[in-house]
Regions:
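N-terminal leader segment of winged-helix/HTH proteins
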Residues: 1-32
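N-terminal helix-turn-helix DNA-binding core of bacterial DNA-binding proteins
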Residues: 21-62, 67-69, 73-75, 82-83
């Protein structure tokens, strides 16, 4: 598979993921903070809670609560940070 073909498939996949996240965000009646965190993760990729909090301009404790709520809804799945 060439780079152009791979890039095309990646664009299609990301578009589908973006659409699904928007649909789920609406269906789940998420808070503004939850929607913002999901959209940032979609755009920027995986991040630690601390990094995400800094990017969103909130305290890590607040982002931890936001991420915890999203995990409990099944919209996020956390994994251990290898640098931790």
């Amino acid at each position: 598979m060439g780079n152009a073909e791979l890039a095309g498939e990646l664009r299609v996949t990301l578009s589908k993921l973006s659409r699904r996240l928007r649909e789920q965000a609406h269906a789940a009646d998420l808070t503004g903070a939850q929607k913002s965190a999901l959209l940032r993760l979609e755009r920027d990729g995986p991040a630690t809670v601390t990094t995400l909090a800094r990017a969103e301009g909130v305290r890590p404790q607040s982002m931890g609560a936001t991420v915890g709520a999203l995990e409990s809804m099944g919209l996020l799945a956390g994994s251990p940070d290898p640098a931790d």
